[in-house]
């Protein structure tokens, strides 16, 4: 059966290899082959070394990968294409930040026959989950959001960036193989990429939370305090989810998940402190709104009195003078305009 599959791979990838007009194009075809049983690591490493030494080659490489992924119905080609793109970030190529939104859409890959019980249904779901993560990650890093995180950034900007990174972690832990038929080397290597990414991003989040919390004090606004509290609550929940995810990966035999990290827990005292800040900010906001409402009511009363006073002291020049001298009416103006 394996021999038949390998023969099919040769038939599918052969024409593309023959048509390849340079060694780099051939490397992309090999790294994204139809082979569901193995992955050509050497070709992928060759591509990464080339990009690191010649950053300008990334754009044509992305076009090659995109062209191959767009027209395939093979989960193996699609997944390997995603892994190859992900590798540009993992190998610390700064030029990878120029990619932005992925130039292909795999959000509905294989949806026509993606039932869980079907032969390739689990693989198609895996591809869609991997794409959702990588597309979101590529967009976030393209915007340079993480790199705007510095001491000069406002507390709100830093909190927003941390929250976006937490969303990236959420998309990572949704990447899971379903079914025993998915326990193969290609999936295992993809999971190693996922675990590596989680370790880097979640570690970054924990360090940044520790940095920004001391800057969350009573003088900041309700928006900042409320967002900080949500981030801390999410971090505590995410720590538990990641522990379960790593246990899952360990059972799968993912090599870099054999030791479950001691995920940082936010001290309960910090959570209580943030909660108090949010409550105080809310009460202050309510008091401010009440004072504003009272001031507006007083202003309306002043306008009404001024209108009445104006009516009292306005002379009607069109009125004819009476025959006899009018009775003198004394208007105590100071009393009318005193408040």
UniProtKB/Swiss-Prot annotation:
Return one Gene Ontology term, BP aspect: clathrin-dependent endocytosis
Q: Which Gene3D superfamilies match?
A: 1.25.40.90, ANTH domain
UniProt keyword annotations, A-Z: Coated pit, Cytoplasmic vesicle, Endocytosis, Golgi apparatus, Membrane
Which Pfam families does its entry note? ANTH
Q: Where is the ENTH domain?
A: 16-148
- GO CC annotations, alphabetized: clathrin-coated pit; clathrin-coated vesicle; Golgi apparatus
Protein name as annotated: Putative clathrin assembly protein At1g14686
The record ties this protein, via PANTHER family, to: CLATHRIN ASSEMBLY PROTEIN, ENTH DOMAIN-CONTAINING PROTEIN
One example of the protein's molecular function in GO is:
1-phosphatidylinositol binding
Q: Does the keyword Magnesium apply?
A: no
Q: Where is the composition biased (Acidic residues)?
A: 295-305
InterPro entries in UniProt: ANTH_dom, ANTH_dom_sf, ANTH_N_plant, AP180-like, ENTH, ENTH_VHS
Task: List the CDD domains.
Answer: ANTH_N_AP180_plant
Which residues lie within the region annotated Disordered? 283-307
Instruction: Tell me where it resides.
Output: Membrane, Clathrin-coated pit; Golgi apparatus; Cytoplasmic vesicle, Clathrin-coated vesicle
């Amino acid at each position: 059966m394996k021999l038949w599959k390998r023969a099919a791979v040769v038939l599918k990838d052969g024409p593309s290899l023959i048509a390849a007009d340079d060694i780099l194009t051939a490397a992309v075809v090999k790294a994204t082959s139809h082979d569901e049983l193995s992955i050509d690591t050497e070709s992928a490493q060759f591509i990464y070394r080339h990009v690191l030494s010649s950053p300008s080659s990334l754009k044509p490489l992305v076009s090659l990968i995109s062209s191959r992924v767009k027209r395939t119905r093979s989960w193996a080609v699609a997944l390997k294409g995603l892994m190859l793109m992900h590798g540009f970030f993992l190998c610390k190529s700064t030029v990878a930040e120029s990619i932005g939104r992925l130039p292909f859409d795999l959000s509905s890959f294989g949806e026509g026959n993606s039932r869980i019980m079907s032969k390739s249904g689990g693989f198609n779901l895996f591809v869609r989950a991997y794409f959702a993560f990588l597309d979101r990650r590529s967009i976030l890093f393209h915007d340079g959001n993480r790199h705007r995180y510095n001491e000069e950034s406002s507390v709100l900007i830093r909190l927003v960036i941390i929250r976006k990174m937490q969303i990236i972690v959420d998309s990572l832990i949704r990447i899971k193989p379903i079914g025993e038929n998915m326990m193969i080397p290609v999936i295992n290597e993809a999971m190693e990429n996922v675990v590596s990414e989680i370790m880097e991003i979640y570690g970054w989040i924990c360090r940044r939370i520790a940095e920004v919390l001391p800057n969350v004090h009573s003088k900041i606004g309700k928006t900042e305090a409320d967002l900080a509290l949500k981030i801390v609550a999410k971090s505590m929940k995410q720590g538990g989810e990641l522990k379960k995810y790593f246990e899952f990966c360990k059972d799968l035999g993912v090599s870099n998940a054999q030791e479950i990290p001691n995920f940082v827990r936010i001290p309960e005292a910090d959570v209580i402190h943030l909660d108090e800040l949010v409550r105080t900010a809310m009460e202050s906001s309510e008091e401010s709104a009440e004072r504003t409402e009272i001031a507006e009511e007083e202003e309306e009363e002043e306008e009404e009195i001024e209108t009445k006073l104006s009516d009292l002291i306005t002379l009607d020049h069109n009125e004819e003078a009476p025959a006899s001298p009018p009775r003198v009416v004394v208007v105590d103006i100071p009393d009318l305009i005193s408040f």
